[in-house]
Amino acid sequence: MPKQKTHRASAKRFKRTGSGGLKRFRAFTSHRFHGKTKKQRRHLRKASMVHPGDFKRIKSMVSQMR
């Protein structure tokens, strides 16, 4: 049986935390900031954790990632 390979696009978007969680960065941060409030822009800077409903699927894609 062949080895399971890491999904490279996912590996670039998610980082493992020390406790085993997955950290992600927020969407809507590349352009068109004039339509967003200062508060929205500030909150978009912070990373967040992957939602539990998506965790199992994403974990299998990045299973080999440390």
UniProtKB/Swiss-Prot annotation:
Write out the ranges of the annotated region (Disordered): 1-20
- Please list the residue ranges that the record marks as compositionally biased, kind Basic residues: 1-16
Keyword field: Ribonucleoprotein, Ribosomal protein
The reply on keyword Zinc is no
- Keyword Ribosomal protein annotated: yes
By sequence similarity, the record places it as follows: Belongs to the bacterial ribosomal protein bL35 family.
Know the name of this protein?
A: Large ribosomal subunit protein bL35
Record lineage: Bacteria, Bacillati, Bacillota, Bacilli, Lactobacillales
